[in-house]
Amino acid sequence: MSYNHKEIEKKWQKYWAKNNCFNTLDDPNKEKFYALDMFPYPSGQGLHVGHPEGYTATDILSRMKRAQGYNVLHPMGWDAFGLPAEQYALDTGNDPAEFTKKNIETFRRQINSLGFSYDWNREINTTDPEYYKWTQWIFTKLYEKGLAYEAEVAVNWVPELGTVISNEEVIDGKSERGGYDVVRRPMRQWMLKITAYADRLLEDLELVDWPESIKDMQRNWIGRSEGANVTFKVAGTEESFTVFTTRPDTLFGATYTVLAPELELVKKITTPEQTAAVEAYIEETSKKSDLNRTDLAKEKTGVFTGAYAINPVNGQEIPIWIGDYVLASYGTGAIMAVPAHDERDYEFAKTFGIDILPVIAGGDITTEAYTGDGPHINSDFLNGLNKAEAIAKMNEWLEENHVGKKEVSYRLRDWLFSRQRYWGEPIPVIHWEDGTTTTVPESELPLRLPVTSDIRPSGTGESPLANIDEWVNVVDPETGMKGKRETNTMPQWAGSSWYYLRFIDPHNKNEIADFEKLKRWLPVDIYIGGAEHAVLHLLYARFWHKFLYDIGVVPTKEPFQKLYNQGMILGENNEKMSKSRGNVVNPDDVVAKYGADTLRLYEMFMGPLDASIAWNENGLEGSRKFLDRVWRLIVDEEGKMRDRITTINDGRLTKVYHQTVKKVTEDMANLHFNTAISQLMVFVNEANKVDALPYEYVEGFVQLLAPIAPHIGEELWQILGNEESLTYVPWPTYDETALVEDEVEVVFQVNGKLRGKQNVARGLSKEELEQIAMNHEAVKEFIEGKTVRKVIAVPDKLVNIVAN
């Protein structure tokens, strides 16, 4: 007999919605628990079975914490701006707002069909003007503090998309979305000064409970390195340039320098003989993305400019080259090369016949670069010193001679914040005809995205908003001065950089959120999502949070106390699920056939939450069979509670019940859901072996199962005679003393040989044990007719009888 999942799931979903069961209780006297999912982008494809894995994990925690007496905040919303909706609108002629609205309805329906305990009164949508009013407000504050600025920067321009994309969205020289060619070109862009927060973004990783691998990814992305800036003069000119090096101690071994091809200086210093080669190389470089140019696996290429730099430590002239692996946007856009001690510089020098001079003893530079340590040689005042001593001495020398100084450099670049697209938050800025720029006054926010039927990219590098004259052109009512609105929009990262704050106070018309409420709910206690957001989203959100902390808007230094990345659910063939492979599993189909509780149970039982595991239909069937077994254990053929559930407790299930409460509670808290489910299975197996099922144990078991399989949990709770939902029924507790074995197995030996075993009460005296041993049938057989010489009894362990 199996239960009717369709009826039961519909019934309880209606009940929860009608009774607002999961509304957040904001009781200041209770402890809080804020469980957050990375909110989804509502795509046209709807939910896939990968989404519910993380959502089920936070839901189990939220349901358990409610029962444990916590105020639980468990919200859901939509990260709904972004390229896919715009691309769809361009392809079909439909309005991206309509498309997005429809997708959200599908997502919400699918999410509700899975029984998640979200507080829908707090639902947010990044495309709602009442929401993006505050995204724009944060931008104006960044602008006021000098952290939002305009700059001419070389950007990744994608002609087919008609927009600029960030470095992180370029994969192997192609756009991540669509796989189109990326071209480098200079454009006016809005930038956010995330570099001002580099040190704090690094240091404060110590404050949070995150996977070490994610912390390392952030550390590497920020890429802090200590070294020195060194100034090189260009021979025969007034020009000079600066290089950053982490090894100033090797300056005597610098035999050439390399400039980024796009530096203005290159054109000024290139000799007529080299002009054609240099220009051709610059043209070639403009077609490559930054990631492509800095790929460590590719061979270094370059062209000689014909000019020479003067090495400041020895006055020697060394050639100046250009190379695409040096970026104008990274460091100073120039490097010094010490080929004797760098493998790639060594290859380059060998290829182009450049001098190689060793300055650290220990290798054989006729065969390869030496990258180990050793005393300095060929280095004048550094000779004989080790690395640390030589770096310190060279830094002093550079400063004394005014040709360099100690410096800290970062890999992190400022955040390119503008997109030449329609479907994003308008940047609240006006450019006036007198050359000044102001932000839109706070009283006029939100600056709404105008409705238009023509969202094609302008093709000029400006966004489609540039085509809407009546929106773009403004006149200052006080002075009559004319101005134009900023036509770039914000990137999709903007709305997701602060959404966790709005969930705390989503209907506040006067501020992002009430400070007292923020004090009560922050930081987020558990944040679960995919590892693909390890760097960007988390770094951007931490940056905005720190800025808001500095201006007194939020009370904590960090937004997310604990972060957890769920693994990926792969297709049955162990490949990533994707439409093109045709291996995507739609949760609607699973819910229809097996039920939402089965899907939830299966995804939590597949393996550890952070592992990537292949989908398996057999596993689904196994999960459904377990729920049917639970149903049959408690419910008879007429749908009523079984007679064997009784108030009589013969003690046979006591130990396994208390073990189950302990293990399930601890495993759920530690996100070890697969082992929690295993323990529930152990209990069911034991319960099926006994005649009488104590009512209190069955109730407790149902409560433990309910966070994982909430619909069947509620139904069984009702069948057990309870009228109210079990949402807030106090969580079961276990008795430590019941976990202790009250019986032990004692071994009986005769003359040192095992002759029998028996379970006895724990803690019996030697005399009592001796008596039991002497009366044991097998022992009696072996001592019959013999004289007992000695009895050795070890309490709770053994009795050895010596007889002959």
Swiss-Prot record:
<dbReference type="GO" id="GO:0005829">
    <property type="term" value="C:cytosol"/>
</dbReference>
<protein>
    <recommendedName>
        <fullName>Leucine--tRNA ligase</fullName>
        <ecNumber>6.1.1.4</ecNumber>
    </recommendedName>
</protein>
<feature type="short sequence motif" description="'HIGH' region">
    <location>
        <begin position="40"/>
        <end position="51"/>
    </location>
</feature>
<keyword id="KW-0963">Cytoplasm</keyword>
<dbReference type="GO" id="GO:0002161">
    <property type="term" value="F:aminoacyl-tRNA deacylase activity"/>
</dbReference>
<dbReference type="Pfam" id="PF09334">
    <property type="entry name" value="tRNA-synt_1g"/>
</dbReference>
<keyword id="KW-0067">ATP-binding</keyword>
<dbReference type="InterPro" id="IPR002302">
    <property type="entry name" value="Leu-tRNA-ligase"/>
</dbReference>
<dbReference type="GO" id="GO:0006429">
    <property type="term" value="P:leucyl-tRNA aminoacylation"/>
</dbReference>
<dbReference type="GO" id="GO:0004823">
    <property type="term" value="F:leucine-tRNA ligase activity"/>
</dbReference>
<dbReference type="InterPro" id="IPR014729">
    <property type="entry name" value="Rossmann-like_a/b/a_fold"/>
</dbReference>
<dbReference type="InterPro" id="IPR013155">
    <property type="entry name" value="M/V/L/I-tRNA-synth_anticd-bd"/>
</dbReference>
<keyword id="KW-0648">Protein biosynthesis</keyword>
<dbReference type="Pfam" id="PF13603">
    <property type="entry name" value="tRNA-synt_1_2"/>
</dbReference>
<dbReference type="InterPro" id="IPR009008">
    <property type="entry name" value="Val/Leu/Ile-tRNA-synth_edit"/>
</dbReference>
<keyword id="KW-0547">Nucleotide-binding</keyword>
<feature type="short sequence motif" description="'KMSKS' region">
    <location>
        <begin position="576"/>
        <end position="580"/>
    </location>
</feature>
<keyword id="KW-0030">Aminoacyl-tRNA synthetase</keyword>
<comment type="similarity">
    <text>Belongs to the class-I aminoacyl-tRNA synthetase family.</text>
</comment>
<dbReference type="InterPro" id="IPR009080">
    <property type="entry name" value="tRNAsynth_Ia_anticodon-bd"/>
</dbReference>
<dbReference type="InterPro" id="IPR015413">
    <property type="entry name" value="Methionyl/Leucyl_tRNA_Synth"/>
</dbReference>
<keyword id="KW-0436">Ligase</keyword>
<dbReference type="InterPro" id="IPR025709">
    <property type="entry name" value="Leu_tRNA-synth_edit"/>
</dbReference>
<dbReference type="InterPro" id="IPR002300">
    <property type="entry name" value="aa-tRNA-synth_Ia"/>
</dbReference>
<dbReference type="Pfam" id="PF00133">
    <property type="entry name" value="tRNA-synt_1"/>
</dbReference>
<feature type="binding site">
    <location>
        <position position="579"/>
    </location>
    <ligand>
        <name>ATP</name>
    </ligand>
</feature>
<dbReference type="GO" id="GO:0005524">
    <property type="term" value="F:ATP binding"/>
</dbReference>
<dbReference type="Pfam" id="PF08264">
    <property type="entry name" value="Anticodon_1"/>
</dbReference>
<dbReference type="InterPro" id="IPR001412">
    <property type="entry name" value="aa-tRNA-synth_I_CS"/>
</dbReference>
